């Protein structure tokens, strides 16, 4: 993230007046929010590769892993709680393609991820929330030009 900021700053001659705080969060790095026991889950990643592993994860078919909805809700709550409170704030969360692929599949209600679905290098997901409390909020997202939304409360009920 720091190198991305440095690169953006060096692309203009104008003095930048922004102040950007970088906060590292364990939920956004591998193994991230989804793994409960790396010793149980790790061999499946090695055997299946990234695409196979994420497909098994979104089907809730791996030992040592959270339920897919629970893992995704944890990441969404982190994003909700760390978003700047002013109207002009923007958060940039940097993660791995595996985590992004899982989040997109789960919030989209899909239990299969194809190679075409896989996030490309530097491809991003734009998310925002409407509502004053996370559990009562509505998640809205844009992925590859398509706008989607879901109720966090209703989404959590799907885990049961």
Question: Which residues are covered by each model-predicted region?
Answer:
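Terminal low-complexity/intrinsically disordered segments and their adjoining alpha-helical capping regions
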Residues: 1-160
């Amino acid at each position: 993230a720091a190198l991305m900021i440095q690169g953006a700053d060096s692309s203009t001659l104008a003095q930048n007046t922004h102040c950007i705080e970088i906060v590292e969060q364990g939920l956004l790095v591998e193994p991230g929010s989804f793994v409960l026991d790396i010793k149980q889950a790790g061999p499946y990643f090695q055997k299946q590769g990234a695409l196979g592993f994420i497909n098994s994860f979104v089907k809730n078919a791996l030992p040592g892993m959270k339920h897919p909805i629970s893992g995704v809700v944890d990441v969404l709550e982190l994003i909700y709680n760390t978003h700047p409170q002013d109207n002009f704030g923007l958060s940039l969360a940097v993660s791995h393609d595996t985590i992004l692929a899982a989040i997109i599949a789960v919030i989209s209600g899909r239990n299969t991820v194809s190679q075409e679905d896989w996030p490309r290098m530097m491809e991003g997901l734009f998310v925002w929330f409407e509502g004053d409390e996370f559990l009562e909020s509505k998640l809205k997202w844009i992925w590859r030009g398509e706008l989607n939304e879901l109720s966090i409360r209703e989404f959590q009920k799907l885990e049961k």
